[in-house]
């Protein structure tokens, strides 16, 4: 599947659509990490890794046009993720705090995060559990991946 951890966390994915597949290769990478990985793959620093994997060592693998294109679910013309979701830098910072660091909403608000945004992200995270339960298995690369080690009530309020 094409989903990443940010999308799986907040349910920004379609059951039997982009969630359909046998393996969620980037399912444990936040969207900002996917962006960084794509930038790195196109950098000179990745040349040795690309060579070891038998990939082209010259030119771009991902490409500037793809890396700079605004993220979109592409379900309607001119749709962008930012129409429905917070900026991924802000979203991923909150998701990391809530998921990996197990911080509470009040703790995040006390640390200076926007209360409305914290409440919204917490609500999205809870309400998306039913989708995560139906997601393809993912490649675990973080200490706290979705799957058997992460469970919320499936019918969140």
Where are these regions (language model features)?
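ATP/NTP-dependent adenylation/nucleotidyl-transfer catalytic domains that generate, transfer
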Residues: 1-157
């Amino acid at each position: 599947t094409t989903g990443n951890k940010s999308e799986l966390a907040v349910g920004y994915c379609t059951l039997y659509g982009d969630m359909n597949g046998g393996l969620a290769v980037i399912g444990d990478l936040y969207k900002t990490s996917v962006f960084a990985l794509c930038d790195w793959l196109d950098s000179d620093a990745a040349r040795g890794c690309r060579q070891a994997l038998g990939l082209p060592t010259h030119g771009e693998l991902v490409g500037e046009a793809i890396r700079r294109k605004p993220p979109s679910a592409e379900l309607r013309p001119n749709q962008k993720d930012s129409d429905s979701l917070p900026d991924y830098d802000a979203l991923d910072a909150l998701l990391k705090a809530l998921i990996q660091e197990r911080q509470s909403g009040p703790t995040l608000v006390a640390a200076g995060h926007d209360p409305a945004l914290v409440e919204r992200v917490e609500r999205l995270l809870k309400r998306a559990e039913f989708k995560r339960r139906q997601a393809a298995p993912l490649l675990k690369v973080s200490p706290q991946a979705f799957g058997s080690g992460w469970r919320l009530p499936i019918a969140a309020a």
